[in-house]
Amino acid sequence: FLHSSKSTSTLASCAAVLAAKAIPIIAEVDNSLTIDPIDLENKITPQTKAVIPVHMRGVPCNMDQVLSIAKKHNLKVIEDVAQACGGSYKGKYLGSFGDCNAFSFQFHKIITAGEGGMVTTDNDLYFDRAQAYHDTAACWRPGGPAKRFASARYQGELFPGVNFRMSELIGAVMLAQLHKLDGIISKMRKNKSRIKNGISDIHGIELRHVHDSAGDTGISLVFFLENGPLAEKFAKALKAEGIEASSIFNKGIPD
């Protein structure tokens, strides 16, 4: 599994790969701080099975190139949309490009029910697998739990599952949150645009590149300064003014 750099991404994506008894291979990021297609292709080996583009901090990866590389090497694509729910790439929603796509509704995501998440796919087999895995694999056999000793639904595909079922209460909250998503995204985009216009003439600030600015969720404003100490000093000054800011994963050292 190929995954964007740990120093600018999150452990959860790698942990999911390890939980599947696979080995995550870390790819570098480009100046958007999302997966670098050039390094992605350089890291592919005969053992590579899938690529996980992480739409980090609300902006889309370069999906044209990611999908092209995946098709060339016959790889599955698993989008990590945890921080970019509601974002898009060239007019198409993030989370609709991959073979499977993962969303998070944890408490500091764009919309939340406190915890929980969602998997989307347009592949019937993958849907059935996900449904079974999250529900102790009981529904994997025809007839569900009542016929747990029936033959396998798909030949040669019996496996243990876990309990990742979302409660009805959290599901109801999330349905209400989904109706608010467009309004939340719109407000964040307007706020980000105002800030960008306000700092456009400040020397030394280089805004992060965004592969499709129209699809940016607006959840964060990321820019580069000359060095790490200056970035930390800058963040401290912003915090003193009541503006939440930090350098990315302070002192984080990838293994």
Give short role names for the model-derived ranges.
Residues 84-90, 97-220:
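Active-site region of PLP-dependent enzymes
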Residues 1, 25, 77-78, 102, ...:
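Structural detector of well-ordered beta-strand residues that form the stable sheet scaffold
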Residues 67-76, 113, 118-139, 229, ...:
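Basic phosphate/pyrophosphate-binding loop/patch that engages nucleotide-derived ligands
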Residues 56, 178, 223-227:
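Conserved donor-binding loops in enzymes that form glycosidic bonds
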Residues 1-84, 88:
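PLP-dependent aminotransferase-like
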Residues 208-255:
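Conserved PLP-binding catalytic core of the aspartate aminotransferase-like
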